[in-house]
Amino acid sequence: MIKRKKLYFMKITIIGSGAWGSTLAQVLTDNNNQVLLYDTNLSYVEKINQGKHPIFNTPLLNVKAVSCLKQTLEYSDLIVLAVPMKFMRHLLKKITLMLTNPKSFVNVSKGIEPLTFLRVSEIVKQVIPAPLLANFASLMGPSHAEEVILRKLTLLTAASSNPVFSLEIQKLFSCPNYLKVYTSSDLVGNEICSAFKNILALINGILVAKDFGINSQAALMSRGILEMSRLVTFYQGNPQTVLGLPGLGDLIVTAFSKYSRNFNAGAKIAAGIPYQQIIDSSLQTVEGFQTLNAFYQLQLKHNLDLPIIQASYQLIFESKPFDTVFATLIQRPYKSEF
């Protein structure tokens, strides 16, 4: 038997008290852990300290929130990152200036950084000095906060290059009654799949709004999974991860659910609303737009075969007519499926 070093945390800091961050606070307190949430949104902080979830009309008990980042960093040695991708690097730079001892990080945000094409794990390693970075893991999978807050059965995957740490995160977040966590060593694949599925959800929202049938949606999912696999391979991840919870599982949830911000944003695109207007009017971040831009630029730079990404970019960012983009995509040369 392998003797493992104890990494279990009884105090956890969550940075970002939005829908998912606050919901994960409930998961952790259900497991008898102590949680401190951080947010710059003072109304969120006030609601949480009143025992209310800041987004949903549900109680959030035994959780405290503050607006002082230094206080939250001093609270525990485990930091859960639950902020949108566009704020990630800036946040990590602020954290680095305040760290005095090594911390472990768990990322629950999904996306790729534009321009750099970096995953969250890569940004963390780039920004946080090695002596101050104890461990890193991602926690991903099909998990609408709207259902988890009601304690409906959900499965997630904790991925880390450190198998001991992924096991500890599995134990920390698993609730016997409603949340089960698997482990994975494919951190790369989990991050890519979790980001890519938001793009397919955007496009599926467009298809549904334009009254395309389930046959068309199934075709989008199938060919989209193939492109997801190509990207995972490009990033040197395990293509098998595409069939796991952060891949196929999260894709189903995001592309077909009424709760999905990306799916609903796609429907608005179909109605002729510009993507920037959708972003500006959304109370919660629609990660699919930024991720689409990042993967499109990556495709151009490395000459990758990602026709759905290319068509989606033309439709959303270049405002090309849907019929024109669709015709170009469907009239691609005939060839073998794989």
From Swiss-Prot:
Where sn-glycerol 3-phosphate binds, per the record, is at K110, G141, S143, K197, D250, S260, R261, N262
Membrane-spanning segments: none
Q: Which Gene3D superfamilies match?
A: N-(1-d-carboxylethyl)-l-norvaline Dehydrogenase, domain 2 (1.10.1040.10), NAD(P)-binding Rossmann-like Domain (3.40.50.720)
Where does the protein end up?
Answer: Cytoplasm
> What is the name of the protein in this document?
Glycerol-3-phosphate dehydrogenase [NAD(P)+]
Whether Cytoplasm counts among this entry's keywords is yes
The protein's UniProt keywords, in alphabetical order, are: Cytoplasm, Lipid biosynthesis, Lipid metabolism, NAD, NADP, Nucleotide-binding, Oxidoreductase, Phospholipid biosynthesis, Phospholipid metabolism
* Catalysed conversion reaction: sn-glycerol 3-phosphate + NAD(+) = dihydroxyacetone phosphate + NADH + H(+); sn-glycerol 3-phosphate + NADP(+) = dihydroxyacetone phosphate + NADPH + H(+)
Catalytic activity, EC = 1.1.1.94
